[in-house]
């Protein structure tokens, strides 16, 4: 996906992330390994709301580490500052980079499904420039945020199996795939 005015971290060799089997992924649904695959697997309702949530989490990270920069760029105000997902994004530059790539992937997927750009993309350039303000570090285990569904939790560092179980159990009753994507195989019980 080519985003006007957006910098995809995949386009910058020194900032590329390894999305192989060793690196997986208010919530961040780690239902696939790669951010593009996650975005394609989200239901229509989530591809509408999740880009804003991810933008808010990324902006919260920048407010935490560089309030002067966040203020200068007029980023979204900090939200849910003690929630595990924003805390994970602000912990290391690698975490932030993964969350940023997921944000860009969701913006592209929204455009694919709805034929227009999501309003949450307005901060993408400032967020991409702000990555250097996040502390360096490798990816860390992602928290499992399943309110009321602790039975879905696993001992995975990158809880794809857990998030798929949660997404299927908690979201399949309302999840629609009418905008150019099919329901993922794993949600149909075939994988």
Functional labels for PLM-detected ranges:
Residues 1-13:
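Extreme N-terminal basic, low-complexity initiation segments
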Residues 13, 17-82, 87-191:
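Sequence termini and other peripheral, non-core segments
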């Amino acid at each position: 996906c080519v985003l006007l005015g957006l910098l995809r971290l995949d386009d910058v060799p020194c900032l590329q992330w390894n999305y192989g089997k060793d690196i997986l992924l208010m919530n961040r649904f780690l239902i696939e390994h790669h951010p593009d695959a996650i975005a394609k697997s989200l239901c229509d309702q989530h591809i509408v709301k999740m880009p804003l949530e991810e933008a808010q989490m990324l902006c919260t990270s920048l407010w935490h580490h560089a309030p002067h920069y966040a203020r200068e760029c007029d980023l979204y105000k900090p939200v849910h500052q003690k929630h595990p997902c924003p805390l994970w994004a602000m912990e290391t530059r690698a975490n932030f980079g993964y969350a940023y790539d997921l944000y860009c992937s969701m913006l592209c997927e929204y455009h694919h499904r709805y034929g227009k750009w999501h309003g949450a993309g307005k901060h993408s350039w400032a967020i991409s420039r702000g990555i250097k303000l996040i502390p360096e570090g490798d990816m860390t285990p992602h928290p499992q945020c399943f309110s009321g569904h602790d039975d879905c939790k696993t001992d995975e560092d990158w809880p794809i199996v857990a998030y798929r179980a949660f997404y299927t159990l908690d979201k399949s009753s309302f999840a629609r795939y009418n905008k150019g994507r099919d329901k993922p195989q794993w949600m149909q019980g075939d994988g």
